[in-house]
């Protein structure tokens, strides 16, 4: 995990706003938003700790890396990967793989 991703997760954990390089975290009363280059890529519901993931319109290596860092923190058994130019989400516990859908809850 990259340093910026550790900083991102720390900011979310402690509910602190953060803006570093191309990644920002904004904390609101009931939700925390994560943005990459200004595009929404993740939200954490502070009441339920549910994580919603988005591609922000860009299915890049960096977006995937940030999403996997978020999932390491908030959905540890889940991960995003790419096969034949398509994104998928896998559950490492069950082995289930589903197509990635922007806005899905993991």
What are these regions (language model features)?
Residues 1-106:
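Terminal leader/tail segments of proteins
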């Amino acid at each position: 995990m990259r340093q910026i991703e550790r900083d991102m997760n720390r900011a979310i954990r402690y509910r602190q706003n953060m803006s570093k390089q191309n990644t920002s975290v904004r904390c609101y009363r009931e939700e925390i938003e994560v943005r990459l280059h200004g595009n929404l890529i993740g939200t954490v519901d502070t009441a339920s700790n549910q994580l919603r993931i988005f591609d922000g319109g860009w299915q890049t290596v960096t977006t995937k890396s940030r999403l996997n860092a978020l999932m390491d923190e908030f959905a540890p058994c889940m991960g995003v990967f790419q096969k034949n130019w398509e994104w998928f989400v896998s559950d490492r516990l069950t082995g289930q793989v589903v197509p990635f859908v922007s806005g899905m809850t993991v």
